[in-house]
């Protein structure tokens, strides 16, 4: 390979270096590399907008510590980008600019730039320039000796003048010179002197300690001081530790700053004490702060005087009287004790009056002979004793008055109750209560005067009972949650339960008969014509106006029949309404509506859509019981959860009690009973009630209005006002008027008399037992019975065979599953019966089984008693349990005396009769039903722990043999084997 020489010049030097040129024979061919595909390119393109916003976002921290982005707006991002572009452009122009030569660089040297430039004169100065020069004053610095001399001079001056020195470091320390034990000593201001109780009473740094050592060295610094001579007012005094004698705590720096003593030991203010020592320490503060607060505020708070004051009373006596007044008005052991203040503030008003009365009397006794000099104090204490004298309140009189008229809130009893409460409070009444009592007394005087005048007149010409022009506010019809989008009332579950009313007490209007067949409403003393015929609207205006007139029926004028009174006062809701001149308001033509409930007596009436019945036909109340519309109106105020119980109570309890054509008083009484169960119905609005004095009938207007006009209008518009009729003391003829009746379609409701409530409904023991036997081998029937009448389970205790048959068929387990989430008391009953079946199965004889069942009656009765209940078998179950319980108690007494009461033959006969009844229930089944019962019993075996069989043979074996014989036949081959299998299954 050839070698060549190359020359490199370094200034004037030359350097020659050999080199060999590279061979060009081998050419390295670059390998083509396929371009890589970025898998995230598309994702970055999609997220470019988000990443751009995230690039300029800032980070912020939420209250819960979460870090989040705070994104900029598009306008803010544009401004930021423009700013960055401008900055990059300026930097680019600077980098691309031509180079410049820097000839000189000076740092804090040379002439300032302003002198290198020529100064052009701005004008001619016509005044003499200022010749004064600024003088720089030297900083005065003291040497250590001069500083010590200054401190010494300040100490001498302040100690002679009893002045103060402030030492300012990180915080200010106040040093005061005062005379203590015959010498002037320095004292600092501690925390307890400012009213603060802290474990460390005084804190200072080392620089302050050094100055305190110099300032505390007064003339008698070295004199001996004993700790027993330290008294109150010496707090904060700086003493010499070396000259201090006695029992004292630790200190530092040769200084002892007095704080207080505990158990004879003197403590330094800089020492940290425990909390127990702090609470019981005697601190040596004085009363200067008290007198400072008194002197500083006395002149500012005193009132102006109309004379010139002179000092005529001794100061010491004034101080003694001031202490007497303080203990008479604000008694305390220590004036600075917060516990005494809290106890005083927490006293009831009655106890405070007693305390002030006692202390005012003690203050008068302590004043003694000085009452002639301090006559103003004597007069004040006498007035205080009189004002706080306890009043002897006779609670028996208050209780007697309250029992008589406490529940009466109408005038004048309301005013009497106000005065009764006023007298009970005695001197605790406020000024407002005094004013209310005076107004009540004024109302009583007016009432008595008016009553006397009316008695003298002996007529009702002054009776007025105006009908309010304002409609009642019904919350249930105004709540948005109860209305649909068209502002119509939503019945919800109430609509379903309202069918109990429509199925029993309403009838469908038959279009084939026409509306005219339903126009006449009959009542015991006459008829009333409905406006149902006007549902067919005539298009002729004259004919339509003629129909709007109605059929006028003349009623007698306002008389005593229209009024209701109690204790000589009118009960206005129970009276007929009148006009301003005293004449009665007569009813007008009420137009009909379709499928509406019309409620409201004052103002405009309200139309509520009726609940839907079983069909789309119109419904009308059956002849004779229009009062059921009152309960239908009450259903509006009933919650959906209580709608079922409410409708059942009305159907099973109220309607049987009212009977046919009840009086207004009976209807009001049932409404009062329903209000106890459902308090929300107290303000339920009623339909308009028309009073017919000629026939002594009250008509409840329904959706079909009234064609007959001229009736009086009852003022009662709500349930609470209607209940006022349910009062024997109410003097009223209207309360004896008839209002509607019971439907003819359900006469059986009142056929049975209940021993628990008059006119109620109850199922007999034999009927209930037949119903129970009917469902033992019918799973679907038993399930429905458990849902409708769960207390049928109790009747299983009448027979051990029935009890174990129900257990083996899983009926108790089914009852627990059905009622465990609905009503746990019924689930408890089923559990007790299941456990009872376990114990009964272990008994060998029938008498032993009866004894076990009778002993469990008490627990079952406790679990069954659950207040008022609407189930028909509930009173039957209670009666059965009560009979068994009473029998067990009587038999137990005889058994303990040695006389067994069970007659074996009687028990066997009863059990045999019930067993045959159980067998007959199974015999009535066809082959398929018998197989179904057998299969269900086999499945029920899996859900219970064990299947129980009685040890006495004959009863259940006959049942099993009857089933197998019916299924397989008596002579079928292999029948014995199949019988055994079926017996095991059962």
Swiss-Prot record:
The entry lists its GO molecular-function terms as:
cysteine-type endopeptidase activity; serine-type peptidase activity
Q: What positions does the record give for the motif labelled Involved in interaction with stylet and aphid transmission? A: 334-337
Q: One GO biological process from the UniProt record?
A: viral translational frameshifting
Gene Ontology cellular component terms for the protein in this record: host cell plasmodesma
EC numbers listed for it are: 3.4.21.-, 3.4.22.45
Tell whether RNA-binding is among the UniProt keywords: no
Motif extent (Involved in virions binding and aphid transmission): 592-594
Q: How is it modified after translation?
A: Potyviral RNA is expressed as two polyproteins which undergo post-translational proteolytic processing. Genome polyprotein is processed by NIa-pro, P1 and HC-pro proteinases resulting in the production of at least ten individual proteins. P3N-PIPO is cleaved by P1 and HC-pro proteinases resulting in the production of three individual proteins. The P1 proteinase and the HC-pro cleave only their respective C-termini autocatalytically.
What residue stretches are annotated with the Peptidase C6 domain?
Answer: 618-740
Entries under Gene3D superfamilies matching the protein = Helper component proteinase (3.90.70.150)
Coiled-coil boundaries: none
Q: Which domain of life is it from?
A: Viruses
- The UniProt entry annotates the active site at 192, 201, 235, 626, 699
Show which residues form the site (Cleavage).
284-285, 740-741
Q: What is one Pfam family matched by this protein?
A: Peptidase_C6
Residues of the Peptidase S30 domain: 141-284
Sorted alphabetically, the keyword list is: Host cell junction, Host-virus interaction, Hydrolase, Inhibition of host innate immune response by virus, Protease, Serine protease, Suppressor of RNA silencing, Transport, Viral immunoevasion, Viral movement protein
Which InterPro entries does the record associate with it? HC-pro, HC_PRO_CPD_dom, HC_PRO_CPD_sf, Pept_S30_P1_potyvir, Potyvirid-P3
Where are the membrane-spanning stretches? none
* Recorded family membership: Belongs to the potyviridae P3N-PIPO polyprotein family.
Protein name according to UniProt? P3N-PIPO polyprotein
- Lineage, highest ranks first: Viruses, Riboviria, Orthornavirae, Pisuviricota, Stelpaviricetes
């Amino acid at each position: 390979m050839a070698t060549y020489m190359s020359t490199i010049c370094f200034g004037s030097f030359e350097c020659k270096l050999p080199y060999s040129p590279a061979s060009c024979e081998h050419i390295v061919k670059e390998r083509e590399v396929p371009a890589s595909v970025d898998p995230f390119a598309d994702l970055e393109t999609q997220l470019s907008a988000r990443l751009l916003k995230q690039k300029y976002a800032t980070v912020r921290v939420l209250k819960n510590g979460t870090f989040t982005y705070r994104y900029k707006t598009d306008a803010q991002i544009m401004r930021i980008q423009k700013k960055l572009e401008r900055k990059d452009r300026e930097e680019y122009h600077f980098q691309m600019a031509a180079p410049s030569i820097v000839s000189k660089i000076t740092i804090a040297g040379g002439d300032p730039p302003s002198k290198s430039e020529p100064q052009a004169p701005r004008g001619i100065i016509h005044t003499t320039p200022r010749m004064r020069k600024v003088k720089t004053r030297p900083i005065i610095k003291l040497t250590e000796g001069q500083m010590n001399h200054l401190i010494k001079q300040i100490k001498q001056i302040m100690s002679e003048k009893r002045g103060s020195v402030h030492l300012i470091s990180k915080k200010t320390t106040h040093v005061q010179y005062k005379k203590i034990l015959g010498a002037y000593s320095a004292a600092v201001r501690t925390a307890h002197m400012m009213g603060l109780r802290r474990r460390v009473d005084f804190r200072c740094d080392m620089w302050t300690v050094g100055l305190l050592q110099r300032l505390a060295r007064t003339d008698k610094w070295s004199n001996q001081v004993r700790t027993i001579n330290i008294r109150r007012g010496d707090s904060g005094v700086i003493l010499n530790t070396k000259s201090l004698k006695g029992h004292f705590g630790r200190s530092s720096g040769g200084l002892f700053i007095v704080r207080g003593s505990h158990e004879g030991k003197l403590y330094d203010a800089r020492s940290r004490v425990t909390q127990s020592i702090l609470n019981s320490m005697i601190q040596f503060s004085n009363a200067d702060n008290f007198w400072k607060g008194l002197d500083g505020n006395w002149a500012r708070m005193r009132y102006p005087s109309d004379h010139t004051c002179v000092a005529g009373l001794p100061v010491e006596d004034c101080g003694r009287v001031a202490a007497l007044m303080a203990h008479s008005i604000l008694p305390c052991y220590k004036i600075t004790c917060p516990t005494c203040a809290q106890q005083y503030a927490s006293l009831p008003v009655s106890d405070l009056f007693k305390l002030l009365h006692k202390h005012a009397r003690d203050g008068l006794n302590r004043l003694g002979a000085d009452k002639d000099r301090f006559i103003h104090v004597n007069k004040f204490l006498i007035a205080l004793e009189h004002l706080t004298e306890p009043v002897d309140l006779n609670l028996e009189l208050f209780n007697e008055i309250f029992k008589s008229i406490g529940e009466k809130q109408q005038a004048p009893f309301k005013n009497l109750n106000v005065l009764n409460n006023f007298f009970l409070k005695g001197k605790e009444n406020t000024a407002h209560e005094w004013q209310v009592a005076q107004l009540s007394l004024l109302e009583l005087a007016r009432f008595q005067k008016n009553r006397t005048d009316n008695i003298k007149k002996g007529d009702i010409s002054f009776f007025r009972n105006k009908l309010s022009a304002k409609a009642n506010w019904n919350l249930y019809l105004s709540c948005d949650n109860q209305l649909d989008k068209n502002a119509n009332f939503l019945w919800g579950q109430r609509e379903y339960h309202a069918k109990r009313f429509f199925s029993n007490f309403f009838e469908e209007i038959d279009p084939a008969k026409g509306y005219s067949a339903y126009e006449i409403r009959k009542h015991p003393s006459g008829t009333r014509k409905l406006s149902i015929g006007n549902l067919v609207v005539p298009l002729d205006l004259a004919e339509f106006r003629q129909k709007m007139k109605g059929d006028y029926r003349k009623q007698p004028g306002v008389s005593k029949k229209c009024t209701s009174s109690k204790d000589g006062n009118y009960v206005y809701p129970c009276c007929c309404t009148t006009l301003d001149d005293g004449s009665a308001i007569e009813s007008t033509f009420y137009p009909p509506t379709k499928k509406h409930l019309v409620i409201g007596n004052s103002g405009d009436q309200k139309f509520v859509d009726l609940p839907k019945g079983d069909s789309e036909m119109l419904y009308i109340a059956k002849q004779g019981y229009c009062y059921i519309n009152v309960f239908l109106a009450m259903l509006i105020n009933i919650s959906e959860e209580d709608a079922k119980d409410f409708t059942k109570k009305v159907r099973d309890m109220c309607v049987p009690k009212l009977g046919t054509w009840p009086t207004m008083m009976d209807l009001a009484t049932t409404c009062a009973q329903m209000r106890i169960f459902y308090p929300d119905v107290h303000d339920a609005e009623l339909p308009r009630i028309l009073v017919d004095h000629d026939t002594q009938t009250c008509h409840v207007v329904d959706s079909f209005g009234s064609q007959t006009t001229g009736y009086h209008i009852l003022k009662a518009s709500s349930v609470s006002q209607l209940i006022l009729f349910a009062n024997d003391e109410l003097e009223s003829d209207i309360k004896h008027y008839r209002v509607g009746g019971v439907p003819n379609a359900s006469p059986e409701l009142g056929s049975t008399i209940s021993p628990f409530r008059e006119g109620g409904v109850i199922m007999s023991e034999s009927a209930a037992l037949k119903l129970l036997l009917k469902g033992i081998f019918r799973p679907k029937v038993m399930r429905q019975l458990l849902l409708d009448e769960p207390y049928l389970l109790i009747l299983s205790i009448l027979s051990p065979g029935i009890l174990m048959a129900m257990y083996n068929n899983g009926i108790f387990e089914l009852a627990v599953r059905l009622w465990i989430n609905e009503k746990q008391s019924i689930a408890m009953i089923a559990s007790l019966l299941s456990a009872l079946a376990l114990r009964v199965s272990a008994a060998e004889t029938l008498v032993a089984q009866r004894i076990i069942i009778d002993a469990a009656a008490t627990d079952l009765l406790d679990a069954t008693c659950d207040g008022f209940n609407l189930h028909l078998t509930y009173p039957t179950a209670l009666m059965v349990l009560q009979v068994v319980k009473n029998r067990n108690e009587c038999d137990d007494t005889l058994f303990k005396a040695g006389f067994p009461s069970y007659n074996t033959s009687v028990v066997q006969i009863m059990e045999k009769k019930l067993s045959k009844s159980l067998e007959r229930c199974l015999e009535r089944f066809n082959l398929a039903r018998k197989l179904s019962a057998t299969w269900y019993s086999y499945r029920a075996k899996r859900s219970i722990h064990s299947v129980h069989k009685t040890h006495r043979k004959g009863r259940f074996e006959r049942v099993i043999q009857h089933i197998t014989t019916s299924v397989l036949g008596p002579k079928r081959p292999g029948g014995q084997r199949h019988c055994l299998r079926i017996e095991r299954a059962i």
